[in-house]
Design a protein with these regions (language model features):
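Non-catalytic substrate-recognition/targeting regions of SAM-dependent transferases
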Residues: 6-22, 29-95, 102
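Conserved alpha-helix/loop element of class I SAM-dependent methyltransferases that forms part
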Residues: 95-113
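Conserved class I S-adenosyl-L-methionine
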Residues: 113-123
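Conserved SAM-binding loop of SAM-dependent methyltransferases across substrates and taxa
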Residues: 124-136
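Conserved SAM-binding motif I beta-strand of class I
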Residues: 137-142
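S-adenosyl-L-methionine
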Residues: 144-190
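S-adenosylmethionine
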Residues: 172-253
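C-terminal catalytic and target-recognition region of SAM-dependent MTase-like enzymes
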Residues: 226-287
Length: 287
């Protein structure tokens, strides 16, 4: 398991009864999490005094705010992100991804050449900002105008607002198909697809139906000297081994190493690790 344990500005305090208690900056939140299938004593006082909590109601849910601004910032090393609770329990950041940021930032910094990164399903740009901060040029693609706008804010906050980042609102699969026809190539590709979603024109995305064909397309946009490929998943039931097998089948086979693991974040109260999805990492030409 790859564990994101280098945070200072974020912590997973405790978990119990389908919920997690988190601290982001100076604010505490309670949010639902399907991985938390156990009950604990909830002895930590912040369970009762959290600044906000998200409660599921029927097929949806809503935030219950006690004392919380509309948004605030938290940092991970030299990266800074805007946090803003929104619908579907989200805040605009997946902190477990920090362990992946550390991995590919090191690859980019030590590549010894300019690196061009394609970030698909790029959301609010955590990976985009991390790659740009390491010196890469980035093409950031997401179907949501609002998320792309937030990514631009995060780039400004992290000091890479003027970096070579190209922001595109588009259906990711269609964008990749066009890039293949144009002959554009990338040294690294990051994919963080949702379990389910819709494109800007109502296109329906379901991970299980699309992931194999999309990874197959990626092999056609990698440069002659690719650096890395990263695939993330939050789909319950899609194991790291299944994802790894797809990647093994679809990506170039020469000079590569492939690893697949769950991601996790340790809790403050007892140091147990909460599973937070999984990733497949491919490193080309480094052994």
């Amino acid at each position: 398991m790859w564990i994101a344990d280098n945070w200072q500005d974020y912590s997973l305090i405790d978990t119990s009864g389908g919920e997690k208690l988190e601290r982001g900056g100076k604010y505490t939140l309670v949010r639902p999490d399907p991985q938390v299938i156990w009950d604990s004593d909830k002895k930590h006082p912040s369970w009762r005094s959290a600044d906000a909590s998200y409660k599921r109601i029927g097929g949806g849910g809503s935030w219950r705010i006690n004392s919380l601004p509309e948004s605030w910032n938290i940092s991970y090393g030299d990266l800074t992100f805007k946090i803003a609770p929104s619908g579907f329990k989200h805040t605009g950041l997946f902190p477990e991804q920090a362990v992946n940021w550390d991995w590919f930032r090191d690859l980019i910094k030590n590549a010894g050449r300019p690196i061009k990164v394609l970030n698909l399903f790029a959301y609010t740009g955590g990976a985009t900002v991390a790659a740009a901060k390491a010196g890469a040029s980035v093409v950031h693609v997401d179907s949501s105008k609002g998320m792309v706008a937030r990514a631009k804010e995060n780039a400004q906050l992290s000091g890479v607002g003027e970096a070579p980042i190209r922001y595109i609102v588009d259906d990711c699969k269609k964008f990749v198909e066009r890039e293949i026809r144009r002959g554009n190539r990338y040294d690294a590709v990051i994919m963080d697809p949702p379990s389910y979603g819709r494109g800007p024109n109502g296109e329906v995305w379901k991970l299980e139906d699309n992931i194999d064909s999309l990874v197959a397309l990626i092999s056609n946009i990698l440069s002659d000297e690719p650096l890395f490929f990263l695939l993330n998943s939050y789909t319950t039931g899609l194991s790291p081994l299944a994802m790894r097998y797809i990647v093994e089948l679809r990506l170039p086979t020469q000079n590569r190493t492939i690893e697949a693991e769950e991601l996790g974040i340790p809790t403050e109260v007892d140091a147990h690790v909460l599973p937070c999805g999984s990733s497949v990492r491919v490193c080309f030409g480094r052994f």
